[in-house]
Amino acid sequence: MHEQYQPREIEAAAQSHWDSQKSFEVSEQPGKDTFYCLSMFPYPSGKLHMGHVRNYTIGDVIARYQRMQGKNVLQPMGWDAFGMPAENAAMKNQVAPAKWTYENIAYMKAQLKSLGLAIDWSREVTTCKPDYYRWEQWLFTRLFEKGVIYRKNGTVNWDPVDQTVLANEQVIDGRGWRSGALIEKREIPMYYFKITAYADELLESLDELDGWPEQVKTMQRNWIGKSRGMEISFPYDVASIGNEGVMKVFTTRPDTLMGATYVAVAAEHPLATLAAQHNPELQAFIDECKRGGVAEADIATQEKKGLATSLRVQHPLTGELLPVWVANYVLMNYGEGAVMAVPAHDERDFEFASKYGLPIKPVVRTSAGDETPAPWQDAYGEHGQLINSGIYDGLDFEGAFDAIEVALQKKGLGQARTQFRLRDWGISRQRYWGCPIPIIHCDSCGDVPVPEDQLPVVLPEDVVPDGAGSPLARMPEFYECTCPKCGAPAKRETDTMDTFVESSWYFARYASPNYDKGMVDPQAANHWLPVDQYIGGIEHAILHLLYARFFHKLMRDEGLVSSNEPFKNLLTQGMVVAETYYRTLENGGKDWFNPADVEVERDAKAKVIGARLKTDGLPVEIGGTEKMSKSKNNGVDPQAMIDAYGADTCRLFMMFASPPDMSLEWSDSGVEGASRFLRRVWRLAHAHVSAGLPGALDVAALNDEQKAVRRAIHLAIKQASTDVGQHHKFNTAIAQVMTLMNVLEKAPTAGEQDRALLQEGLETVALLLAPITPHICHELWQQLGKPGAIIDAQWPKVDEAALVQDSLTLVVQVNGKLRGQIEVPASASREEVETAARGNENVLRFTEGLTIRKVIVVPGKLVNIVAN
């Protein structure tokens, strides 16, 4: 074992072992638990950026962990290869998009391999290849014949710069999502997917997706936007709020309006901001809500928390004043960011009201009766006859809906709303670099789908577009053809499909990428699907994830897959952000400098307080941390990182710096720290191995000091297993391993048992880090004399007996100040603990002459003696 940690050699050796052994190629193994782990495939833009590295490292850690659980793990990779950037690059460099795309794929594939990802490359798909898109064309012709795809004149969003049509979702604040150009409306004939026919199912089956972040499901619900309900305005109480106005809520249960006992607003709601102005406690809670998590924590399952404000709003029918609460279960981007809370008939409101002692007023007679005692019963949410509702008593849901609507309309405080926001998906694009639409236009037969035996309609790959509309429309050799029905001269469709179509089904093709008898091999598809864990950015919450769910249902209805949903669990990783630096130009613009070219000065808390450009030594402005981007020139090249430190350091930093669903702030010192930690692990292992490997550990013969070391080992296993396996909190799992390393570095190594214990400790470190830093762990495992490769080892099991403590160290406080420590048997009673604390020599000094009023014992932690 080399004395120094040499990442380059270690990583090359591990990768070459995995390649030669085909370690990550999988096949269907009936009877073995499967795990399909998928990260969103990249667009081959030229080279990987840190966002890619983060995404694929998270996926890889999960895949490798699941393999250590004994599962048959599929982790494939491919290329979302059609799209606008290839055309733009082609125009700029006068090169065919195909050539540019394939060169980028080759380079990026090598980059992905250098990260050491456990990918089955035998399943690679490239969406711009005819053997992939022919099946997309086949499905198109099937759906066209069934009427699920149709052609009509549509008013479209026309991007005058990109010369193409954009979907509604691709228009942000009236501008094109890619070009930033102001969008025009135009009428042209287009093909549409009838996604509205699936709107109800797309909405309803969201409820089955327990493993999805609530935020994403909410965004999809809002996008589909089915709402049969009422918008109700609660007038401000001027005395407490200080001005006139209304708080709007949208409710699907206006029949329960008379049971509203408080209102709850999201942390970002204007009333929350107002209430927090002179209330530091509330401001702190709001900050906590904003930090926390709709990203990963499922709102439905997290603990409901809230704080009261001094604000009141008026009940729109009774005028009664209702308190305004700020609550973590109300989302700003759902509805109006406020809810009228009816605890008797809504489970979340019920939980909240019960916790905070708010009134619960039943106003609907349900199958559970007229009362709503705790605990919550599903029956409380039923429709039924109104009670305790004054003039509305006795009305059913429909009757109450109508009567309450009339009353609210009279006051100008409410109206009914029912709608779907979702529109059919227009997929025609006047672009070249996309999948050709398989339709032939015949003067006598109309629009004729291309017959299956004539598929694929191949896109010519040697075209260099010039930016003015579609080159295909100027290529008679492409569009001139004969009608498959009548044989007359006809014209091929020259529009191509929206590139979101390719990414809507790629996950299914991975199950049988080389199958040539259909879109998927149903047997293989049903073996692997649905995907167990999908990982990608929150920016795909609506578009891609909605379209993929839609396509999965289309494939199901074609008999290709049997499941209803494509992705069982979804993890949306946060952005990678970094400091920005600039100088303001004379024209008011900004010249951005890469952090690598800037010398910074930091204060004691490591905050940047000054910056100079290395080349001229003159100051630059500090722009704050922003998402890494070309426009702000604050990207860090992953390749430079891997070359300098190795992939394991890169991976360790990515996983340690932040939980996966939060933003990750780039930090050179953090990368240095990750590198230092791996060198520490290597040093300890080297010293241990050089002394010769020890014999077996005799657990029964351990002394107290050795028991404490072994307890640290198994505590790390226990914590890391929960963190990685249940919560994807890789950062805290790594912290556990760091804590364990501190113990192992100080542990004695004199005796044979000491060394056997260190062997168990180092094996544990290697196993716990194996999914995160696979190369160094591959090498350590061999050096520690273990048979086989660590990728085939089992995740370590906790020995609960090792966690049992014979004695505990408790701190003793006098009037809240630390005054001593006591050691007591773990089985000691409260009285024995109290006696030991009172008798502590230092404690006696501080209680002398005082009367002890009470003794507070926090089991396992501390004793506080209150004396005066």
From Swiss-Prot:
Q: Name one Pfam family in it.
A: Anticodon_1
Molecular function, one GO term? ATP binding
Chain location of the short sequence motif 'KMSKS' region per the record: 627-631
Name used for this protein in its record: Leucine--tRNA ligase
Q: Which UniProt keywords apply?
A: Aminoacyl-tRNA synthetase, ATP-binding, Cytoplasm, Ligase, Nucleotide-binding, Protein biosynthesis
Reaction equations catalysed: tRNA(Leu) + L-leucine + ATP = L-leucyl-tRNA(Leu) + AMP + diphosphate
Localization of this protein: Cytoplasm
An example Gene Ontology CC term for this record? cytosol
Task: Tell me the gene name.
Answer: leuS
Gene3D superfamilies per the record? 2.20.28.290, 3.10.20.590, HUPs (3.40.50.620), Isoleucyl-tRNA Synthetase, Domain 1 (1.10.730.10), Valyl/Leucyl/Isoleucyl-tRNA synthetase, editing domain (3.90.740.10)
Q: What is its EC number?
A: 6.1.1.4
UniProt lists the family membership as follows:
Belongs to the class-I aminoacyl-tRNA synthetase family.
Keyword Aminoacyl-tRNA synthetase tagged: yes
Which positions are tagged coiled coil?
none
BP-aspect Gene Ontology terms: leucyl-tRNA aminoacylation
Primary location group = cytoplasm
Instruction: Give start-end ranges for motif 'HIGH' region.
Output: 42-52
Query: Where, in this chain's numbering, is ATP bound?
Result: K630
